[in-house]
Amino acid sequence: MGEANKFDLYVPADTSKESYGLVVYLHAGGFTTGDKADDAGMLQWLCSKGYVAAGINYTLFSEQHPEANIYTQSMEIKEAVPAVAAQAEKLGYPIDAMAIAGGSAGHCLAMLYAYRDADTAPAPVRMVFGAVGPSSFYPEDWGCYGLDQGTEESNAAAAGLFGVMAGRSITPDLFGTSAYDEAMKDVSALLWVDGGTAPSLMAYGKHDKVQSFPASIRLDEALTAHGVPHDYIVLEHSGHGLQNDQQEFHQYYQKIEEYLDRYLPVE
């Protein structure tokens, strides 16, 4: 794997078990910045609970890597997860089940892995959790960037932005058609939701200016429609940083523990 895809692996002190649960946590940074080291605290906490925990880097969209996009990043994660499990096994920690999670961009990538790529995983994906990750790209939902105006100008801007994100050529005439869903499906976790989707915990800020809050409503509705066990925590007074609703923020972290105990119990 390339430099960008190196991973940090945290393994528990107890080596006596026949198998372990793996939790992958993907870093935030708007697909352009960030590093697995940013999540050392989260990874150490997961490890202290008895999990094998891993942070994975992915190639960031930049002047050096103008070809990087959500799709290429998601494919790097897809390739990296089996390598993480193989390394854990080599160290004496065979993996029998896993969860994947992340913040913001990392949450977007975690959902894509759990919803789109679970059948390629080295162990069953039992759950996904995360905060403020985009799961679909409909211009009418992206008022945070003024892309919901329905004008020639705003549609052109939306086509440009979403095209870069997907690594596809998107033209405004695609909006509102099934061809648009087809073009964006590989980067839209929403479009992979079905009855077999992994239990999902997610938190979103109602005043998010960085990614689309309305997209999270669509996701909640899709998970509900397909009977997927999930919790959708809305921070009514917060933006992307989930900074103004201490009670709900605390509830999100409590729910992480609940979900791990329920879906990925440490035996």
Task: Name each model-derived stretch.
Residues M1-E267:
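Alpha/beta-hydrolase superfamily serine-hydrolase fold, recognizing
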